[in-house]
Amino acid sequence: MTMNQTVLGFDYGTKSIGVAVGQSITASASPLLALKAQDGIPNWDEIEKLIKEWQPDLVVVGLPLNMDGTEQDITQRAKKFANRISGRFGVKVLTQDERLTTADAKARLFELGGYKALTKGQVDAVSAVLIIESYFENQYD
């Protein structure tokens, strides 16, 4: 891993795609927003704006798997989303196991603000943070 990388993380979903940005130098990430998706199809112009704004060295897309590691129906769609980002924008894209990120994101948000903090967009954006953080953890294992 180079000295400092900017990493954009996506928590792919069919209705909403959480987005976060991270820095490898601090191995931390911050939630940005949740993009609306229609049946898994994002507004590619919005993604292009994010790529241009943050100029990531790497994009990490969460890979939804069952607890036993097998693929779900949405796993292939997340892989396709990752491939499209790579193809459209020419950035390096990796996938990261995202098992438990939604539960962890809800727990983290609940600690900060109770039930009112648990809006779908916030959960998705914090899930994207956790995807980036787990990517960083795996780099140093």
Swiss-Prot record:
Fetch the InterPro entries from UniProt.
Answer: RNaseH-like_sf, YqgF, YqgF/RNaseH-like_dom, YqgF/RNaseH-like_dom_sf
Question: Which key words are in the record?
Answer: Cytoplasm, Hydrolase, Nuclease, Ribosome biogenesis
The UniProt entry, under HAMAP family, shows: Nuclease_YqgF
**Entry similarity comment:** Belongs to the YqgF nuclease family.
Its cellular-component GO annotations read: cytosol
Q: What is its main location?
A: cytoplasm
MF GO annotations: nuclease activity
Entry-linked Pfam families: RuvX
Question: Where is the protein situated, by its record's location annotation?
Answer: Cytoplasm
> What does this protein do, in the record's words?
Could be a nuclease involved in processing of the 5'-end of pre-16S rRNA.
List its EC numbers: 3.1.-.-
List the SUPFAM superfamilies.
Ribonuclease H-like (SSF53098)
The top EC class, named as a word, is hydrolase
Q: What is this protein called?
A: Putative pre-16S rRNA nuclease
Q: Name one GO biological process term.
A: rRNA 5'-end processing
SMART domains in the record? YqgFc (SM00732)
